[in-house]
Swiss-Prot record:
It comes from Granulibacter bethesdensis (strain ATCC BAA-1260 / CGDNIH1). GO terms for molecular function: 1-(5-phosphoribosyl)-5-[(5-phosphoribosylamino)methylideneamino]imidazole-4-carboxamide isomerase activity. It is an enzyme of class 5 (isomerase). Pathway: Amino-acid biosynthesis; L-histidine biosynthesis; L-histidine from 5-phospho-alpha-D-ribose 1-diphosphate: step 4/9. GO terms for biological process: L-histidine biosynthetic process; L-tryptophan biosynthetic process. This is 1-(5-phosphoribosyl)-5-[(5-phosphoribosylamino)methylideneamino] imidazole-4-carboxamide isomerase. Its EC number is 5.3.1.16. The keyword Isomerase applies. Belongs to the HisA/HisF family. The active site is at D10, D131. It comes from the Bacteria. SUPFAM superfamilies: Ribulose-phoshate binding barrel.
């Protein structure tokens, strides 16, 4: 499977932001027009975009619909969306609006039947977001930590047709200290579902670390991309061998 780089567009109050460790009060604003950012990443050569409705993740419903719709109107590359999507109506609404892949996070823990139903209704279009703190899954915009282990949650959906798992190490997110390759790789080896790494990329070497690990199928790029620590062309070149 082709290794994919996913520029992240995290939305808070209609703005493009980056958080540290998921803390809403520790947000850096990177622009008031997310659609412009989306075009920028598409023009840089990225084949996918990763969009998160941060307000929605806390509220349990879409809160940045206008910005998301603007992004969809601005680009032709596929977009995956997470944050606040907790029922089938929301899944249907976003897929009909043009989202290529819907990410279910809190719902995967609290209403796993939704994941199964959505996978049947929209084959190949549903991903599971596993956000872990010390190996245990966090929910509700990371405000709560469950007693469910990340590997255990992945196993629940092994044969349900999930298109991908986005695995985020919360402690690394936005910190630029490098992704948790070891835990991500362990998860990827424990499931047949493609696993995408998220959280902690700070420079090109971190991308190469994930790429060279094998088994992991992609990585999400956030603060390092926005701060200019990662050059898009160099990153795309580095992962072009498979």
């Amino acid at each position: 499977m082709r290794f994919t780089l996913y520029p992240a567009i995290d939305l808070k109050d209609g703005q493009c932001v980056r958080l540290r460790r998921g803390e809403m009060e520790d947000a850096t604003i990177y622009g008031n027009d997310p659609a412009v950012r989306a075009r920028q990443w598409q023009d840089a050569g990225f084949a996918w975009l990763h969009v998160v409705d941060l307000n929605g993740a806390f509220a349990g419903r879409s809160e940045n619909a206008e910005a998301i719709t603007a992004i969809l109107g601005a680009v032709s590359v596929p977009v995956q969306l997470g944050g606040g999507i907790r029922d089938m109506a929301a899944v249907e609404r976003w897929i009909e609006a043009g989202i290529s892949r819907v990410i279910l996070g809190s719902a995967a823990v609290k209403t796993p039947q939704l994941v199964k139903d959505a996978c049947r209704a929209f084959p190949g279009r549903i991903a599971v977001g596993i956000d872990a703190r010390d190996g245990f899954v966090a929910t509700e915009g990371w405000a709560e930590t469950s007693s469910v282990a990340a590997v255990e949650l992945a196993a629940r959906f092994e044969d349900e047709g999930v298109a991908a798992i986005i695995y985020t190490d919360i402690g690394r997110d936005g910190m630029l200290t490098g992704p948790n390759v070891e835990q991500t790789l362990a998860l990827a080896r424990a499931t047949t579902i493609p696993v995408i790494a998220s959280g902690g990329v700070g420079d090109l070497s971190h991308i190469v670390d994930v790429y060279d690990a094998g088994t992991i199928t992609g990585v999400i790029l956030g603060r390092a991309l926005y701060d200019g620590r990662v050059d898009p062309a160099a990153a795309l070149q580095a992962v072009s061998l498979r």
